[in-house]
Design a protein with these regions (language model features):
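Short, Lys/Arg-rich flexible segments
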Residues: 1-154
Length: 154
């Protein structure tokens, strides 16, 4: 982030740099993770999310290898945009609330990426095994299991 801020020209860049430094200092005792989290999400949802994000080999004798559908990676630009909009509302006195808000934005961004799609279509065999034709959407488990957690730094 620091190298990027050096390239931001003008007063707006230095204002943003100061704002981000305040946030970094205020949040130095905690951080937020989002996605499919051990101890929060079910092991089945974590495995399913991993296979969908990165792809997998054959899932049955009838099926072809499962292609990667990087829904979490695709969510990042929208999450970054939403986080930039939330920076002005950050209060240094409430870093835990800010991190919880950031985590909610991140988890919602992952859910939206699943819903919006734009992925390679399901194979005929897969279509025969599920209710709809939308990749990544079947039971709603992956959307429901996307989570966030605010953690203390070690």
């Amino acid at each position: 982030m620091g190298a990027t801020l050096k390239h931001v020209a003008g007063r707006q860049g230095s204002t943003l740099a100061r704002r981000l430094q305040k946030i970094r200092t205020a949040c130095s005792r905690s951080y937020v993770v989002a996605g499919y989290i051990a101890g929060v999400s079910t092991p089945a949802a974590i495995a399913k999310a991993y296979k969908n994000e990165f792809g997998a080999g054959r899932t049955s004798d009838l099926d072809k290898p499962m292609p990667a559908r990087p829904f979490m990676a695709m969510a990042i630009p929208d999450i970054v945009y939403a986080m930039r909009k939330s920076l002005p509302a950050f209060h240094v006195e409430q870093p835990e609330e800010f991190l919880a808000s950031a985590g909610a934005v991140m988890a919602n961004g992952i859910r939206e990426s699943i819903d919006l799609g734009g992925f390679r279509p399901n194979a005929p065999y897969t279509l025969s095994q599920k209710r709809g034709d939308k990749p990544l959407v079947d039971s709603g488990e992956m959307q429901a299991e996307a989570a966030f957690q605010v953690r203390a730094t070690a």
